[in-house]
């Protein structure tokens, strides 16, 4: 019994492709095994006749193997594990053949031309070109986009004929100029603009009453820099209230008291401290217009009243125990 017969008896029948590959070798091994069994089982008397009868096929098979040694050479078997045996049918050096194959394949120039390049060239040569194929120099960018030191021209007044002729342009000035980009942030507040909601104006976005009626429709809508201008005005603080340095210029100078008058003359007249601020002709319409200023006045008037209520007589002497 041969090694192949033992292996396939243990691990079951071979696969179809293995069976097709090993069929001639199985037949040859079975033929030689039958010959050996027949020679051993033959009697000594008939050994001569048996040897003469079996002498003819043996030389024929030997000649056949000598005539085609490469075709009939069995594959090389390599044991990998208990369930895998590798058979190699290739004859020769595998590494040299692989190197020769790849060197031959790499030596030939590539004749592959992708269809995407041809279609792209055809599309670019046509009358319609894609937007991405235009270079940056052919696009309609203003001069300040290419030159950072470009100075934007001064816009003409609204009443001039030059401004009327170019009024249909989308931009009155260059949108990329530094003066245009930073002009809105540093522009001061208008004279008519106030941060308080009770100062209604047609241009104010929060104006009430008639500002939202026919009068507002006659004026253009306020720009962004007009709405947010008080944020960047140095006269206003972080809470949109005028700073302390800007108030004395708006208020009327107070009259200096007489030398002989007491310091509480304002409170002695019976006139409240906040009435001068809330008067119709005063600088503010109501005390709520400026919360910080009214609080400061109330604190000052309280201090003056306390000073007037204190007795001016000398302190009383405490009685001493005799």
From Swiss-Prot:
GO MF annotations in UniProt: transcription coactivator activity
GO BP terms: positive regulation of transcription by RNA polymerase II; skeletal muscle tissue development
* Subcellular location field: Nucleus
Which key words are in the record? Nucleus, Transcription, Transcription regulation
Q: Where is the composition biased (Low complexity)?
A: 42-61, 248-258, 270-283
Region Disordered, as annotated, extends over 42-75, 248-322
Q: In which tissues is it expressed?
A: Skeletal muscle specific.
Sequence ranges of Basic and acidic residues compositional bias: 62-75
A GO term from the CC aspect: nucleus
Q: What is its main location?
A: nucleus
Q: Where is the composition biased (Pro residues)?
A: 312-322
| Pfam entry (one) | Vg_Tdu
Assembly, per entry: Interacts with TEFs. Binds to TEAD1/TEF1.
Per the record, the similarity remark reads: Belongs to the vestigial family.
Q: What does this protein do?
A: May act as a specific coactivator for the mammalian TEFs. May play a role in the development of skeletal muscles.
Its recorded name reads: Transcription cofactor vestigial-like protein 2
According to its UniProt entry, this protein's organism is Mus musculus (Mouse)
